């Protein structure tokens, strides 16, 4: 335990909590424009072609965002909405694209977990 003299000379430091999604500026989502849409490969031991986009946000930050689901319609200059949430096997990807919002279409033919992929309920 520290003495009072020690605490007067050197007070206790507050823990600094670092945000996992700094580019969002404490907002739930942010809008941005795609500057590049491409695929990349994940870290070992996984193997795939993950779809990602480089996005310039409304606060002038440039981030890399993951495009989830099967198939997408994004290209350069598409306006998209991003949310937080990293992709564990893609280094540097800390954001997800919100499907079904702005220029991004939902996933076609999706029956389960539709709300996460912006898909409307299908008519029987």
UniProtKB/Swiss-Prot annotation:
GO CC annotations, alphabetized: small ribosomal subunit
Biological role stated in the UniProt entry: With S4 and S5 plays an important role in translational accuracy. Interacts with and stabilizes bases of the 16S rRNA that are involved in tRNA selection in the A site and with the mRNA backbone. Located at the interface of the 30S and 50S subunits, it traverses the body of the 30S subunit contacting proteins on the other side and probably holding the rRNA structure together. The combined cluster of proteins S8, S12 and S17 appears to hold together the shoulder and platform of the 30S subunit.
InterPro entries: NA-bd_OB-fold, Ribosomal_uS12, Ribosomal_uS12_bac
Any matching Pfam family: Ribosom_S12_S23
Keyword S-adenosyl-L-methionine (UniProt): no
Subunit structure of this chain's protein: Part of the 30S ribosomal subunit. Contacts proteins S8 and S17. May interact with IF1 in the 30S initiation complex.
Keywords on record: Methylation, Ribonucleoprotein, Ribosomal protein, RNA-binding, rRNA-binding, tRNA-binding
Name under which the protein is recorded: Small ribosomal subunit protein uS12
Residues modified as 3-methylthioaspartic acid: 89
GO biological process: translation
HAMAP family linked: Ribosomal_uS12_B (MF_00403_B)
Similarity annotation: Belongs to the universal ribosomal protein uS12 family.
PROSITE patterns: RIBOSOMAL_S12 (PS00055)
SUPFAM superfamilies linked: Nucleic acid-binding proteins (SSF50249)
Molecular function GO terms recorded: rRNA binding; structural constituent of ribosome; tRNA binding
Source organism (scientific name): Ruthia magnifica subsp. Calyptogena magnifica
